[in-house]
A protein has these predicted regions:
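Secretory targeting and sorting signals
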Residues: 1-36, 435-459
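Extracellular Ser/Thr-rich, low-complexity/disordered mucin-like segments
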Residues: 2-6, 404-444, 460-463
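Short loop/turn segments at connectors of secondary-structure elements within structured domains
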Residues: 29, 221, 265, 341-343
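Short, surface-exposed polybasic-aromatic patches that bind anionic ligands, especially phosphate groups
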Residues: 36-166, 172-188
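Short, ordered beta-strand-loop transition motifs
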Residues: 64-68, 81, 203-207, 248, ...
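Acidic/charged, solvent-exposed loop-and-adjacent secondary-structure segments enriched in E/D, K/R, S/T
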Residues: 167-319
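Membrane-proximal extracellular "stem/stalk" segments
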Residues: 261, 276-423
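Conserved, compact domain cores that house catalytic/ligand-binding motifs in diverse enzymes
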Residues: 337-359, 427-463
């Protein structure tokens, strides 16, 4: 196992200092002319794909013939420190070289409508690398002798049978017996919780009060809370008791304490922790790598995870907080506008007019085609403007009849195959340095005014 505890605190401290996070995917703004373009995010781990590292061969049986593919464990380097191991859950879609990934809930991935998603999690928890006693694993499966490569291949094959529902066999007989055992034994388990999220990621309200709450959800023992650099004087991050907060844990409620008479403005906070990402969390490509093969977590070292939340305040008038997140079940992006002001918030979204009364919120689901780049813009009174961009990737490529990739990882086919002697992550000896990904170059298509919307209305919680 990679021992990260001695370096975890140092990594986290460095990450807090280095991080210039703005709450991507959420904005709360009091300005009369705010314009931002963000990608919906969920918080948690972000990482760069290093390639297929521990693998053997498998054969996919298609109507057009058989195709041999690599099957096994991928490796990712976590931003600001940490290493992840993952399996593929999108066999027909290749990975992209040095693709950037983010941790997401199943609802924002191809698992959203997969009734076998829980069986995949069972396989992950009951096979390699979580089970690293290969002799014991082989005995259970009646597989003879297993190596790290064949154990990884058999595990991947079993996962594909549930993630993509394809006919696929491992080439190695022992790996095939392991795959059959895992497939027959798998039970449906629940979705694992996120490593770190903040809910909601944007709040708003009148100055002279505590604005929030923003609730911390995490599996980490402790989370470091940091205000944005250059936060307005007098604005504090506090708990329910009104005392300043610099650390938090699961369930902690955070508030932005804005002094009375403060000039209209906005700021944000960053939450960061060092923890192991739960096995079974989904990872999807982001930015220019949004269409890269979807992955699912098999093992994690202690890794840096983060989330952010924004706040805005005014003395009077409409005070909106806007958030967006993918909704794979409805095939679109949920845009939620909450208004904590004393006047209605009026805005346009894709050619339609909306009005949110004080103390209310409304969610609009904007339909987006699968694999379609989108640029969704909200325009409000006084020059208010907010845009969300990305690519909707909610289905396995097999849904469109694509052929499986013979090279699941063009980035790196090969590498080390280390063994884990007692924990979550097989030792790979990878570097913690994470390559920086250059800017996003995606052609964005504005969602037109002719789109159909699904609406939900609800009261916002009290501050």
């Amino acid at each position: 196992m990679l021992s990260m505890k001695r370096r975890g605190a140092a990594r986290l401290a460095a990450a807090v200092v280095a991080s210039g996070l703005v709450a991507a995917g959420a904005i709360a703004t009091a300005g009369t002319a705010a314009a931002d373009d963000t990608t919906p995010t969920h918080g948690g781990a972000t990482a760069t794909l290093g390639g297929l590292k521990t693998f053997d061969q498998a054969v996919v049986h298609n109507d057009g013939g058989d195709q041999r593919v690599g099957a096994g464990l991928f490796e990712m380097a976590v931003d600001n420190g940490g290493t992840l191991q993952t399996y593929c859950i999108d066999i027909h879609n290749p990975t992209q070289q040095q693709a950037k990934y983010q941790e997401v809930p199943w609802s924002a991935s191809s698992l959203h409508n997969n009734g076998d998603a829980g069986k995949i999690r069972w396989i992950l928890q009951n096979s390699y690398p979580q089970v690293n006693d290969l002799a014991a694993l082989a005995s259970k499966a009646g597989a003879g002798n297993l190596t790290e490569k064949t154990a990884a291949a058999g595990t991947q094959v079993a996962i594909w049978r549930f993630s993509d529902h394809v006919k696929v066999d491992a080439v190695d007989p022992a790996a095939e017996k392991l795959a059959d055992y895992l497939e027959k034994s798998a039970q449906n388990l629940g979705e694992p919780k996120a490593s770190l999220t903040l809910d909601p990621p944007a709040v708003s309200g009148k100055s002279g009060s505590k604005l929030g709450p923003v609730t911390v959800h995490t599996n980490a023992d402790s989370v470091t809370i940091s205000p944005a650099a250059g936060a307005p004087a007098g604005v504090k991050i506090v708990g329910k008791d009104g005392k300043p907060v610099t650390s938090a844990a699961e369930g902690t409620q955070l508030f932005f304490d804005v002094p009375k008479g403060a000039a209209d403005g906005s700021t944000s906070l960053t939450a960061q922790a060092a923890t192991k990402v739960p096995v079974g969390r989904a990872f999807t490509g982001i930015g220019e790598h949004a269409k890269s093969q979807t992955q699912i977590l098999a093992g994690s070292s202690e890794s840096t995870v983060s989330a952010a939340a924004t706040v805005s305040w005014k003395k009077q008038g409409a005070i909106p907080a806007i958030t967006a997140e993918k909704n794979c079940a409805k095939g679109g992006v949920d845009v939620t506008a909450a208004n904590k002001g004393d006047e209605a918030f009026r805005f346009q979204l894709s050619g339609k007019d909306y009005e949110i009364a004080p103390g209310k919120s409304q969610t609009v689901t904007v339909p987006v085609a699968e694999d379609q780049p989108y640029n969704i813009t909200i325009k409000g009174e006084g020059g208010f403007k907010k845009s969300f961009s990305g690519v909707l990737d909610c289905k396995t490529a097999g849904s469109g009849g694509g052929k499986p990739s013979s090279k699941p990882s063009p980035a790196s086919v090969g590498g080390s195959t280390g063994g884990d002697k007692g924990g979550d992550l097989a030792e790979t000896g990878s570097s913690n340095a994470t390559p920086m990904i250059a800017g996003i170059a995606v052609v964005l298509v504005v969602v037109g005014g002719g789109a159909v919307f699904f609406l939900r209305k609800k009261k916002t919680g009290t501050a």
